Amino acid sequence: MGRHSFKTVSIDEFLELTLRPDLLNLIKKEHHKLMKVKLPGTIANFSRPENSSKNRSTLFPCWDESRVILKSPSKGIPYDNDITSTYIHANFVDGFKDKNKFICSQSPMENTCEDFWRMILQENCHIIVSLTKVDNAVYCYEYWANEKYREKVFGKYVIKTLEIIEEEVFTRSRLLLTDTNNDISQEIHHFWYTNFPLHYGWPIMSPELLNLIFHVDQKREELMNTTGSGPIVIHCSKIVSWTGIFCTIYNALSQVREEKTVSLPQTVLNIRKKRHSSIMNWVEYEICYRVLCEAILNLKTFMYCNLEIFSAFQDKVAAINFYFGKSHNKHSFNNK
């Protein structure tokens, strides 16, 4: 299979692109081209009958090659006797330049909460981003306590909520995860954003999403400069939808900041190679365009842009917002 790559453009070129009257058709064609790229990989562990109870859906597989493999807490190696003990529906996903920057996971179910916390401790994860409502059924099981000083217990893992901070658009909690068998504790920073639409109606609140990404990135930088941290864990009710959008915007913004360039299709392709079924729908891809577009308008990266292009773009922001909104009013999807 040949190597697939997409064109990288400057910020100026990206801004010019978003001003085109045929932008929606361009987005659809670009997404169609993405979907035609054959991805390498197998889904053998996802398909095992023994693991079916650990999957929320049969429609969205988990790649073998990038999956998180649960290990024995005592030996540090995968279990030999019980193949289901190594499995969790979660994959490592690279950042723009950082390998395994994220773990993209399905939202915990009642029977997978213990595995979820085992993964958090095993991979030294200190940040969790939840992009879903909690209903203990369809969307997400309550794997942490949304009340100060309360505890949740899953097997040998005790999760105590130490602090809850209500930000403008999300809830930030500080948790203490303890492995009671080995007397090991780890502090967790939990970001809970519930304003994602359950279906693909518009609008998605771009400033809110960007605010969330900023705070998550800020916390990660703080941890990396002090105690260190493993991957950022992200999950959503749709298994892959909003998780894929979050990672796409995060990585694209990293490229914008570091290199003053962007390649949205290449960013999506790289994520799809690690997390099966990510950005499957062109509407998801359009959302990525919209949010990135607004991010470039609001970040300090404008100092690197052509001022004439920037001014022209500013003049048309209202029209573009109306355009995107109109397209989403016409196309609403309930298929994930």
Curated annotation (Swiss-Prot):
- MF GO annotations: protein tyrosine phosphatase activity
Query: At the top level of its lineage, which domain of life is listed?
Result: Viruses
Please list the residue ranges annotated as the Tyrosine-protein phosphatase domain.
27-295
- The UniProt entry's coiled-coil ranges are none
Family annotation (SUPFAM superfamilies):
(Phosphotyrosine protein) phosphatases II
Q: Which SMART domains match?
A: PTPc, PTPc_motif
Among InterPro entries, the record links this protein to:
Prot-tyrosine_phosphatase-like, Protein-Tyr_Phosphatase, PTP_cat, Tyr_Pase_cat, Tyr_Pase_dom
Q: Which family does the record assign?
A: Belongs to the protein-tyrosine phosphatase family.
PANTHER family reported for this sequence = RECEPTOR-TYPE TYROSINE-PROTEIN PHOSPHATASE (PTHR19134), TYROSINE-PROTEIN PHOSPHATASE 1 (PTHR19134:SF449)
Record's protein name = Tyrosine phosphatase-like protein H1
Task: Report which gene this protein is encoded by.
Answer: H1
